Amino acid sequence: MAKEFSRTQRVAQEMQKEIAIIIQREVKDPRIGMATVSGVEVSRDLAYAKVFVTFLNDNEPEQVKIAVKALQDASGFIRMMIGKAMRLRVVPELTFSYDNSLVEGMRMSNLVTNVVRNDTERRSVTGEDQED
């Protein structure tokens, strides 16, 4: 019977859960604020992990840089806590990266909404029939 997910994918999923809990409950750095772990990519040899995070108040790029730097500074502590929570021979070295896909998705959604609204207004002004 074939495995649905590789070991690296399973480790990445479990690490995502554990890192989110650790950041929420254990890391007490005020620079981080409300962080969400949106994904984890683990190397094939499980030596390195890239952690993608988003922040609740990510309007200012400077605040995002400060928060990512704070997470990177706390990576040793987070790695130690992962080692206690998960049974791994080697706990991956963590690298934190800001995930702007949520912000980009919202921006694209707003652009589409504006185009549809403008098109509807233009059609109502000119009296054209709506064509789908």
Swiss-Prot record:
Keyword set for this entry?
A: Cytoplasm, Ribosome biogenesis
Q: Which GO terms describe its molecular function?
A: ribosomal small subunit binding
Where in the cell?
Cytoplasm
Q: Does the keyword DNA repair apply?
A: no
Instruction: Name a single GO cellular component.
Output: cytosol
Q: Which PROSITE patterns does the protein's record reference? A: RBFA
Q: Which cysteines are joined by disulfide bonds?
A: none
- Matching InterPro entries, A to Z? KH_dom-like_a/b, RbfA, RbfA_dom_sf, Ribosome-bd_factorA_CS
Matches recorded under Gene3D superfamilies: 3.30.300.20
Q: Does the keyword Hydrolase apply?
A: no
One Pfam family from the UniProt entry? RBFA
Domain of life of the source:
Bacteria
What family does this belong to? Belongs to the RbfA family.
Q: Which HAMAP family match?
A: RbfA
Q: What does this protein do?
A: One of several proteins that assist in the late maturation steps of the functional core of the 30S ribosomal subunit. Associates with free 30S ribosomal subunits (but not with 30S subunits that are part of 70S ribosomes or polysomes). Required for efficient processing of 16S rRNA. May interact with the 5'-terminal helix region of 16S rRNA.
Subunit: Monomer. Binds 30S ribosomal subunits, but not 50S ribosomal subunits or 70S ribosomes.
**This protein's name:** Ribosome-binding factor A
Q: Which organism is it from?
A: Pectobacterium atrosepticum (strain SCRI 1043 / ATCC BAA-672) (Erwinia carotovora subsp. atroseptica)
